[in-house]
Amino acid sequence: MSRLATRFEQLKSQQRKALVSYVMAGDPQPQVSVPLLHKMVEAGVDVIELGLPFSDPMADGPVIALAAERALAAGTNTLDALNMVKEFRQNDSETPVVLMGYLNPVEVIGYEKFVSHAKACGVDGVLLVDLPPEEAKEFDVVLKQHDMDQIFLLAPTSTDQRIEHVVKQASGFIYYVSLKGVTGAATLDVTEAAERIAKIKTKTSVPVGVGFGISDAASAKAMGQVADAVIVGSAFVKPFATLAIDQAVEQTVNKVKELRAALDELV
């Protein structure tokens, strides 16, 4: 059983919800990332999404886009991000790690080379934001050869046809985007999300996580009631835009604790 499947099974047996954290690799400095990931796991993160810095992150709001700029300015590239996972794995062989990024850098490296190296470093799955399921078959074949999961996005605007494509191909978990827009946007419609997630879950046993717009205990708890996982990015990344590194790490870890406590109230 994959690390993702194992983690979701464990949580399900405990009637707990997964807290999935997004961190941009190399933000604000490459040496910050691995210690930060360990601290976040210690504070209650169940699954890590590691962002691959890219110069044109079209699906991301200003917080994540600026994080990508900081990481790139610090010299972080895609292979550096994979090596961070390798370093993380020296002390953590259990927490699933999913890479989240864009297609272009992966195509430049080549599917086989990228996936085999990612697997060797200890990566469990990949979410390429701009690779729709209809065009993802070739990449999926390579991932499956290496026992890795391909994570797909679904949104309030997804057609029935897109939902069918995703539930057929997805493994690990499905990432439901709770807002029409970019990451870190402001307003959440819990009722609409609940209806859409319920519809998706009638078609698949793959866990469904919900993200975009979750930034505090109240929104985490609300979404935790309707999904298997709550995915948080901007709220963890934001402190690094303005604070000294130590302060930013502390604030991010405290945010993890706040959200973990909120989700555990649902047990």
Swiss-Prot record:
Top-tier EC class: lyase
* Pfam families in UniProt: Trp_syntA
Q: Which UniProt keywords apply?
A: Amino-acid biosynthesis, Aromatic amino acid biosynthesis, Lyase, Tryptophan biosynthesis
Q: Is this entry keyworded Amino-acid biosynthesis?
A: yes
For this protein, the Enzyme Commission number is 4.2.1.20
Q: What InterPro entries does its record include?
A: Aldolase_TIM (IPR013785), RibuloseP-bd_barrel (IPR011060), Trp_synthase_alpha_AS (IPR018204), Trp_synthase_suA (IPR002028)
The catalysed reaction is: (1S,2R)-1-C-(indol-3-yl)glycerol 3-phosphate + L-serine = D-glyceraldehyde 3-phosphate + L-tryptophan + H2O
Keyword Lyase part of the UniProt annotation: yes
CDD domains listed in its UniProt record? Tryptophan_synthase_alpha
> Where are the bilayer-spanning segments?
none
GO CC annotation, single:
cytosol
Active-site residues are E49, D60
Q: What exactly does this protein do?
A: The alpha subunit is responsible for the aldol cleavage of indoleglycerol phosphate to indole and glyceraldehyde 3-phosphate.
Q: Which HAMAP family match?
A: Trp_synth_alpha
In terms of NCBIfam families, this protein maps to: trpA (TIGR00262)
* Protein name stated in the entry: Tryptophan synthase alpha chain
The species this protein belongs to is: Acinetobacter baylyi (strain ATCC 33305 / BD413 / ADP1)
> Could you read off the lineage of the organism from its UniProt record?
Bacteria, Pseudomonadati, Pseudomonadota, Gammaproteobacteria, Moraxellales
